[in-house]
Amino acid sequence: MNIRVTEKTPGKDGDAGWLVLIYRVPPEPTRLRSTVWRRIKSLGAIYLQNSAAALPASASTERALRKLRREIIEMSGTAVLLSCSVLAGESDVHKAFQAARNDEYEEIVDRCEDFLQQVKKEYTANHFTYAELEENEVDLVKLRNWFAKVRERDVFDADGRQAVEKALEECEQSLEAYAARVYAEEAEGH
């Protein structure tokens, strides 16, 4: 399994190494747990077990996890950040990372399908205005940005990426066709 590394990373024998954050957050208020969970998810980390999250080691992931560790401590929690290598079960960790990214990719594909349905509704309702076009353009930009964030976290090149690329291409083509229709309708004064 190949790891895509964009920075020098610690480790031996070409192994990028791993960073593991083990933490405990006070049970109340519950928003603290949610904040930590969202931050860990946004970094692309996976949970090895409750309150133990792992990421491939890099300078940027180390900075992000150090920052999160400080925030947890400021929440009156405890946290330790470890740099380590996997002695056994590394393929399981890789699979867990790929599954997490594939889940995110699948969600983006679902949203792309929603986008295509929305454009189809515009045709059905005969809504060919610049306002509708702009709204759809904004939605497509959001999808592209979301994909870029997930792609950045996808250090093991999960298979689901190709499906998103195809779905986004379909969205772009659909929006281009819709835009052409809007311009034609506006030119005719409809």
Predicted regions and their residues:
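Transmembrane beta-strand segments of outer-membrane beta-barrel domains in Gram-negative
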Residues: 127-140, 148
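Positively charged, polar, low-complexity stretches
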Residues: 1-120, 125, 145-148, 152, ...
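Alpha-helix boundary/N-cap detector
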Residues: 103, 107-110, 131, 138, ...
